[in-house]
């Protein structure tokens, strides 16, 4: 059997924890001062799908909407270059009055078509959706609650599957990943919508998977290496799982990079969230979750089971 090279991952762990602390501080400050650029799903607004008879530049459409009084419209191609998706957060005062009636969305849609048809183009209104501010607020609250519930369930699972110190380390590492990902969106002011929220939840699952694999090897090695120091057990466990972690992350990142570059504007932010989150999650499974086990003074005694249990574990 080939001997695995043991790397001293914990040697720079203090510097890595310091780096994580700085990044967390920057993220929290940015979230508190700049906030997050919420998408239509969370802030409310109107989404309209229109069709043109021939390809058209999005800048031209954006300029027409601004001149008609629609502030900061989002205009993107989807599918063919004749298919346009419009997202309007702020609408003219006259149009705002129409939102009090049941015909709000059709009325806004007709105003948009009129503005875009001013130069003689034949515009086809294909679909229109309106998200009210109250619905957006409910989605924000439910999205935040969903992330908290996910972290609570993770902590319960790891506590039952492993031990409470493992659970605390896993949840703190996941919270680290979520805060840094949210901080990334705050600093870049990329739009945060439901697809990005789904990406953040996917990051939680991906990072947890990496952490569980490391923790499972740590537990196994604590039982096998009875006279080895905890730091050496963790270094050996990380070395044994290193290539599996790197290979999985690398292949996943290749797919996400292709989505980010070629996927179009509609999934650009979704891919960006996953790219950043998986990079951070891979890092945290090594230098945050594992280091936290040492800070929590994990030892073989924490994992001891009754003799009958150990005999069962040792069976082939």
Where on the chain are the PLM-derived regions?
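A structural signal for conserved, well-ordered secondary-structure elements
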Residues: 1-316
């Amino acid at each position: 059997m080939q001997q695995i090279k043991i790397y001293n991952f914990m040697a720079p762990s203090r510097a890595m924890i310091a780096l994580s602390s700085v990044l967390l501080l920057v993220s929290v400050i940015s979230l508190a001062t700049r906030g997050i650029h919420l998408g239509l799903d969370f802030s409310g607004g109107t989404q309209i799908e229109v069709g043109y008879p021939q390809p058209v530049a999005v800048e031209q459409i954006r300029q027409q909407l601004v001149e008609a009084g629609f502030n900061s419209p989002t205009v993107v191609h989807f599918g063919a270059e004749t298919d346009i998706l419009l997202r309007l957060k702020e609408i003219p005062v006259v149009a705002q009055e129409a939102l009090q009636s049941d015909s709000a969305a059709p009325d806004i849609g007709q105003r948009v078509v009129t503005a875009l048809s001013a130069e003689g183009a034949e515009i086809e209104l294909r679909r229109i959706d309106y998200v009210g501010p109250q619905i957006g607020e409910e989605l924000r609250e439910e999205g935040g609650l969903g992330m908290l519930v996910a972290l609570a369930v993770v902590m319960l699972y790891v506590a039952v599957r492993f031990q409470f110190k493992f659970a605390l380390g896993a949840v703190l590492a996941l919270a680290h990943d979520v805060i840094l990902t949210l901080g990334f969106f705050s600093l870049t002011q990329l739009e945060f919508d439901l697809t990005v929220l789904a990406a953040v939840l996917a990051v939680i699952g991906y990072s947890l998977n990496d952490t569980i694999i490391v923790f499972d090897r740590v537990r196994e090695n604590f039982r096998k290496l009875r006279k080895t120091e905890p730091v050496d057990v963790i270094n050996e466990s990380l070395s044994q799982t290193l290539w599996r972690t790197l290979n999985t992350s690398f292949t996943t990142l290749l797919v996400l990079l292709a989505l980010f570059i070629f996927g179009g504007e509609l999934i650009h932010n979704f891919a960006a969230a996953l790219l950043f989150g998986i990079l951070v999650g891979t890092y945290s499974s090594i230098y945050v979750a594992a280091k936290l086990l040492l800070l929590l003074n994990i030892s073989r005694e924490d994992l001891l089971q009754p003799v009958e249990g150990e005999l069962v574990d040792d069976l082939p």
